[in-house]
From Swiss-Prot:
Region (Disordered): 135-154
Organism expressing this protein natively: Coxiella burnetii (strain RSA 493 / Nine Mile phase I)
GO cellular component, one term: cytosolic large ribosomal subunit
Positions bearing N5-methylglutamine: 153
Name of the protein described by the UniProt record: Large ribosomal subunit protein uL3
A Pfam cross-reference name: Ribosomal_L3
Keywords from the named record: Methylation, Ribonucleoprotein, Ribosomal protein, RNA-binding, rRNA-binding
Post-translational changes noted in the entry: Methylated by PrmB.
Similarity-based family: Belongs to the universal ribosomal protein uL3 family.
Keyword RNA-binding: yes
Length: 217
């Protein structure tokens, strides 16, 4: 992982290019990303930044965390996240520094991680795109049933990982190689091409892409 930002998904809109093409984008607001701890190879065995984002009342923070924020001389945040660093990345940064959207640039490709919308208990048709069974021809009860879930005496059990009904959504998901269309430094906004996981208002973590596109190779 490389240095990144934590933001809040605001929703989707579209912007137009000079040629008149419409590009769907997701607006992400980056709210007060502060470095609370700098981890080094000497002290921790690896290089990383611990980042707090957002604001939280000091009365809502337990004493160990309050002491941690006080040591870094930063306001309490909603949560802490850690970003692993390469050997040459941001070597001069220190605890208390604020990270802003200008660490990314327009046209850069990023990975975005977020918590998907929870959809409750779902059947196999909705959860795994199973086809439905016959509507008629003697079928009166099993239109959306999954069908057989295994064999008989051998193996005498249901295989692990069998696609069945269950909880849908409410899991962390990462979308890769999303292009940054616009960086708004004044309002601390990132406009990222396409849809991102999660509901509006949800937390998203933006990092440099772990893959290279063909045109970048």
């Amino acid at each position: 992982m490389s240095i990144g930002l934590i933001g809040r998904k605001c929703g989707m809109t579209r912007i137009f290019t000079e040629t008149g093409s419409s590009i769907p984008v997701t607006v992400v607001e980056v709210i007060l990303n502060r470095i609370t701890q700098v981890k080094t190879v000497e002290t921790d065995g690896y290089r990383a930044f611990q980042v707090a984002y957002g604001k939280k009342s000091s009365a809502r923070v337990n004493k160990p965390l309050a002491g941690h924020y006080s040591k870094a001389a930063v306001e309490a945040g909603n949560a802490l996240r850690e970003f692993r660093l390469g050997n040459e990345e941001l070597t001069e940064a220190k605890a208390g520094d604020e990270l802003k959207v200008d660490i990314f640039k327009e046209g850069q490709v990023v990975d975005v991680r977020g918590l998907t919308r929870g959809k409750g208990f779902a059947g196999t048709v909705k959860r795994h795109n199973f086809r439905t069974q016959d509507a008629t021809h003697g079928n009166s009860l099993s239109h959306r049933a999954p069908g057989s879930i295994g064999q008989c005496q051998t193996p005498g059990r249901v295989w692990k990982g069998k696609k069945m009904a269950g909880q849908l959504g409410n899991v962390y998901c990462t979308v890769q190689s999303q292009e940054i269309i616009k960086v708004d430094v004044e309002r601390n906004l990132l406009l990222i091409k396409g849809a991102l996981p999660g509901a509006p208002g949800g937390e998203v973590i933006i990092t440099q892409s772990s893959k290279k596109r063909k045109e970048d190779k």
